[in-house]
């Protein structure tokens, strides 16, 4: 089976039929004001011919790498017709009669060609420029940029030859040449006159390092009755403009530059498995007198700076005198005093060692006991009579003194060295002999036993308990938290209320006449005055320190309880008419008092 037929062409209108325009109306068209517009015809659903889909699917194919497209291959059928006169199947087409009418052969009228050179177009030039001015500019440019190098047939596109520009600027129209020609022809574009492109051109990138280019340039000859190899001739009237190329375009013949890496896998493997060792050249040794020259240069700079500072405010005569003066002592003369002896004496340190040792002794020994170590005499300054004092003797004496004082194996108690016969122990960040580490009160040996540090003095447990304060209530030693109150010392659990036995730690309390401790509620309940009316104690209100009471008829009353017994009016001596008028120890107001008197008098 051949390829599917192409899709049908658009339908043709019958001869003489004209579609009405939107801008004018036909005579048969109804008026808009009188009659409504006719309903538009029902649109038919567009259909797609199956043969057209098959034809479109058959043209779809995948192009391989470096494969030319269909348009680049000559005489290649587009897939529509296998033979020149193959008829398309009509099928059920709507315009079958019209297609058959168009398919009929018709006679064609030949148009005679015009005479030769009758209508020859001129090459387009720059309409806004004078060709003569361009020619003069090119001539002056050639004079400045003259070169003796031979003209190359291969020139890049963007590099124009001045001779070519001048040639085409002054070129007059001439008939096309027939036959062989050895001169280079340049294509002049009919759309642009500002640039001319050389006929034979190549890419500006040349890979001459990887392959040898042996291609030669061949000028293609053309004739008026035949086409060139690329079929790239275009006719404008009777003039034929030929697009000449160095060789026919064939994508399969394109030379590609070879990669300098022949095998990438081998290069990667070699780089990853080979250790490249580079020989490091040792720098040449410095000259032997380099250090001496650097020292001399540094000394010269220092001396120059010192002399510059010295001579800054002097006159010329003073500067000359300074340059010519010599030192009072020559370099060979000896110093009048012994410098080494001064250095040795400065490192003896007898005075400092004596002060450090004395300070340690005073800190470690009690104040009432004298230190048991030997006091080293202070070193006196050497005078003229002791100038010949032996340096060896001073050094040995100083070293022995320093060893005794700075030795860490010295007992703090007795000041003697700890040896194997007299072992020591470490306590309170100090070192003691075992026999010297005793209790400060009972002289009990404390080595290997528990002790208490009281004012930097070791104390045994018995002496420590005896030194503690005793509770006033239970007469026992207080080893933990204690309370001091009322001139005594108490345990927390021993300082309690005398009535309710509640601990008074952090609670207000008071004393009675027998110095018994009571809490405030128990004290008021036990010793506060009672109200004569309600028989309750009169205590201070919340937040108050003192209680308020009313005393009448040698009795105490609450403020709220001091009122008339008959009418219940609050009695107060500050308000007129509200005073208390008692009868037989009864609280009565003035009115109730008169009423009771009238009743008694009536009876």
UniProtKB/Swiss-Prot annotation:
GO MF terms, alphabetically ordered: DEAD/H-box RNA helicase binding; metal ion binding
Q: Which GO terms describe its cellular component?
A: actin cytoskeleton; axon; focal adhesion; M band; nucleus; stress fiber; striated muscle dense body
List where Basic and acidic residues composition bias occurs: 69-95
User: By its UniProt entry, which SUPFAM superfamilies does this protein fall under?
Assistant: Glucocorticoid receptor-like (DNA-binding domain)
Q: Where is the composition biased (Polar residues)?
A: 184-193, 315-333, 363-373, 382-391
Major localisation: nucleus
Give the matching SMART domains.
Answer: LIM
Keywords (A to Z) from UniProt: Cell adhesion, Cell junction, Cell projection, Cytoplasm, Cytoskeleton, LIM domain, Metal-binding, Neurogenesis, Nucleus, Repeat, Zinc
Top-level taxonomic group? Eukaryota
Q: Give one GO biological process term.
A: maintenance of synapse structure
Question: Where is the sequence biased in composition, kind Low complexity?
Answer: 218-234
Against InterPro entries, the record matches this protein to:
Znf_LIM
* Expressed in which tissues: Expressed in neurons and body wall muscle. Expressed in pharyngeal, enteric and uterine muscles and in spermatheca.
Disruption-associated phenotype: RNAi-mediated knock-down of isoform a in a dys-1/hlh-1 double mutant background reduces muscle degeneration.
Give positions of region: Disordered: 1-131, 166-193, 218-237, 310-333, 363-395
Q: Which CDD domains match?
A: LIM3_Zyxin_like (cd09357)
Start and end residues of each LIM zinc-binding domain: 409-470, 471-529, 530-601
Query: Where is composition skewed (Pro residues) in this entry?
Result: 1-13
Q: Where in the cell is it found?
A: Nucleus; Cytoplasm; Cytoplasm, Myofibril, Sarcomere, M line; Cell projection, Axon
Note the subunit structure: Interacts with dyc-1. Interacts with glh-1 and glh-3.
Description of its domains:
The LIM domains are sufficient for the role in PLM synaptogenesis.
Function in brief: Functions both as a mechanical stabilizer (via LIM domains) of focal adhesions, and as a sensor component for muscle cell damage (via N-terminus). Regulates, stabilizes and maintains posterior lateral mechanosensory (PLM) synaptic branch extension and new synapse formation and growth during larval development.
Family to which this protein belongs: Belongs to the zyxin/ajuba family.
- What name appears for this protein in its UniProt entry? Zyxin
User: Which organism's genome codes for this protein?
Assistant: Caenorhabditis elegans
């Amino acid at each position: 089976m051949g390829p599917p037929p192409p899709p049908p062409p658009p339908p043709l209108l019958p001869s003489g039929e004209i579609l009405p325009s939107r801008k004018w109306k036909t005579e048969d068209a109804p008026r808009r004001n009188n009659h409504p517009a006719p309903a538009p015809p029902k649109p038919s659903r567009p259909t797609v011919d199956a043969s057209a889909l098959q034809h479109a699917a058959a043209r779809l194919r995948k192009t391989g790498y470096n494969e030319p497209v269909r348009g680049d291959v000559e005489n290649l059928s587009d897939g529509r017709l296998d033979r020149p006169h193959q008829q398309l199947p009509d099928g059920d087409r709507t315009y079958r009669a019209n297609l058959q009418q168009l398919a009929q052969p018709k006679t064609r009228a030949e148009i005679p060609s015009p005479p030769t050179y009758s209508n020859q177009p001129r090459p387009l030039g720059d309409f806004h420029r004078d060709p003569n001015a361009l020619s003069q500019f090119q001539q002056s440019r050639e004079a400045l940029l003259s070169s003796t190098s031979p003209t190359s047939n291969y020139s890049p596109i963007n590099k124009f030859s001045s001779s070519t520009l001048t040639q085409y600027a002054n070129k007059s129209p001439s008939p096309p040449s027939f036959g062989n020609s050895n001169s280079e022809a340049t294509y002049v574009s009919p759309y642009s006159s500002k640039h001319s492109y050389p006929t034979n051109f190549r890419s500006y990138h040349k890979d001459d390092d990887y392959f040898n280019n042996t291609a030669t340039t061949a000028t293609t000859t053309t004739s008026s009755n035949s086409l060139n190899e690329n079929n790239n001739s275009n006719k404008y009237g009777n003039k034929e403009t030929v697009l000449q190329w160095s060789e026919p375009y064939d994508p399969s013949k394109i030379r590609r530059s070879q990669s300098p890496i022949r095998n990438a896998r081998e290069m990667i493997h070699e780089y990853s498995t080979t250790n490249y060792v580079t020989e490091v050249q040792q720098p040449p040794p410095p000259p032997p007198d380099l250090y001496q020259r650097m020292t001399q240069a540094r000394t010269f700079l220092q001396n120059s700076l010192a002399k510059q500072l010295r001579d800054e405010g002097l006159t010329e005569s003073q500067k000359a005198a300074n340059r010519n003066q010599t030192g009072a002592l020559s370099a060979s003369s000896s110093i009048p005093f012994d410098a080494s002896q001064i250095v040795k004496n400065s490192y003896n340190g007898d005075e400092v060692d004596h002060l450090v040792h004395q300070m340690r002794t005073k800190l470690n020994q009690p104040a009432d006991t004298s230190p048991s170590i030997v006091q080293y005499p202070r070193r006196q300054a050497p005078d003229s009579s002791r100038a010949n004092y032996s340096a060896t003797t001073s050094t040995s004496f100083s070293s022995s003194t320093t060893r005794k004082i700075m030795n860490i194996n010295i007992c703090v108690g007795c000041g003697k060295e700890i040896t194997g016969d007299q072992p020591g122990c470490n306590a309170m960040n100090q070192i003691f002999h075992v026999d010297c580490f005793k209790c400060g009160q009972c002289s009990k040996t404390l080595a290997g036993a528990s002790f208490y540090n009281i004012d930097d003095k070791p104390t045994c447990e018995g002496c420590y308990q005896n030194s503690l304060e005793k509770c006033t209530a239970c007469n026992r030693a207080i080893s933990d938290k204690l309370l001091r109150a009322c001139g005594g010392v108490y345990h927390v659990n021993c300082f309690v209320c005398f009535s309710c036995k509640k601990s008074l730690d952090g609670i207000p309390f008071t004393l009675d006449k027998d110095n018994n401790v009571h809490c405030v509620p128990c004290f008021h309940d036990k010793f506060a005055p009672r109200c004569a009316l309600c028989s309750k104690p009169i205590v201070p209100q919340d937040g108050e320190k003192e209680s308020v009471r009313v005393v009448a008829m040698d009795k105490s009353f609450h403020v709220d309880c001091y009122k008339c017994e008959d009418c219940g009016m609050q009695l107060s001596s500050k308000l007129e008419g509200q005073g208390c008028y008692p009868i037989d120890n009864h609280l009565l107001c003035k009115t109730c008092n008169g009423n009771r008197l009238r009743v008694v008098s009536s009876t």
